[in-house]
Amino acid sequence: MKFNFRVLFPVVLMAFLGAVGFGGQAVAGSATEIDIAVDGGLEKFKKEVAGGAEFLDKAKGYLVFPKVTKAGLVVGGEYGEGALRIGGTTVDYYNIASASFGLQIGAQQYAIVMVFLEDEAMKKFRESKGWEAGVDGSVAIAKWGAGEDINTQNFKDPIVGFVFGNKGLMAGVSIEGSKITKLEK
């Protein structure tokens, strides 16, 4: 029997998230709900990241997932919905999802902001039918000194990711293997 991850993953993830009480919060947001949440996520980003507003203004575009829920009990997963903005305007909606297996227990929520610094990276992302971090493109998770202006950094990767929770920017978090898929809203 052939294992079909694409069919099994959403079923397992939804069952698990529903069981731990995140099902209704994590999925099926309307375009308006997503845009409102993205606005809030961007405000937090600009507050947490010195020079963040200017950095986003210079970007080719940015993808914001304001609430990503990650939960696990041996089998785990993450899910969130967000919007791609170009020039400050929402152009498309996306979800991010991943699955993991192994020793894990618990749940957490965080936000992800992926900033596209090059046109080619943005084009490749938008033309994909399902984009996987680390496979279809590399995302450098931003690391720099607290209070330092982000615009002083010289990023070599075409996509820079920021992950932050209730207590600010999070270190040691990876989005490698996360699948990002366009939503029809």
Residue ranges of model-derived segments:
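Bacterial N-terminal signal peptides that target proteins for export
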Residues: M1-V12
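Small-residue-enriched, tightly packed secondary-structure blocks
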Residues: V27-K185
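Bacterial N-terminal signal peptides
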Residues: P10-G21
